[in-house]
Amino acid sequence: MGLEKSFILFPLLILVLGWVQSSLGKESPAMKFERQHMDSTGSSSSSPTYCNQMMKRRNMTQGSCKPVNTFVHEPLVDVHAVCSQENVTCKNGQKNCYKSHSTLHITDCRLKGSSKYPNCQYQTSQQQKHIIVACEGNPSVPVHXDAXV
């Protein structure tokens, strides 16, 4: 009887361990936001190749070229604080977007018209704009960059 239980429990244990391992490897929406949009150092954001380098480094040119992306060059705590600022309607109609009170230093990356995967080439543009982010969770943190205005 003990051996029969082992044959039943062992596959169940393997399934549970597989599920735990796969869930540990998943990127949360907040982590994805940080990977795709945060660059607090902004060390070389003035370089014309900044977007080409960062889009590749942050895995936004795998399988296709992401057409538009914004990097924010402010401390993460300041970007998190936007989630408690002016509540605005998101582009998709949802009500969980927030607009920064002040303008922030950002870099706008736009895919050049002639650029095609796998050679993704971006136009780099430094700007000072308000950001609008979608926020979720408790505490509320940014999970999506909605716009820069």
Swiss-Prot record:
The active site is at residues 37, 144. It comes from the Eukaryota. It is an enzyme of class 4 (lyase). Residues 1-25 form the signal peptide. SMART domains: RNAse_Pc (SM00092). Its EC number is 4.6.1.18. Pancreas. InterPro entries: RNaseA (IPR001427), RNaseA-like_dom_sf (IPR036816), RNaseA_AS (IPR023411), RNaseA_domain (IPR023412). Keywords: Disulfide bond, Endonuclease, Glycoprotein, Hydrolase, Lyase, Nuclease, Secreted, Signal. It is found in: Secreted. GO terms for molecular function: lyase activity; nucleic acid binding; ribonuclease A activity. It catalyses: an [RNA] containing cytidine + H2O = an [RNA]-3'-cytidine-3'-phosphate + a 5'-hydroxy-ribonucleotide-3'-[RNA]; an [RNA] containing uridine + H2O = an [RNA]-3'-uridine-3'-phosphate + a 5'-hydroxy-ribonucleotide-3'-[RNA]. Monomer. Interacts with and forms tight 1:1 complexes with RNH1. Dimerization of two such complexes may occur. Interaction with RNH1 inhibits this protein. Belongs to the pancreatic ribonuclease family. This is Ribonuclease pancreatic.
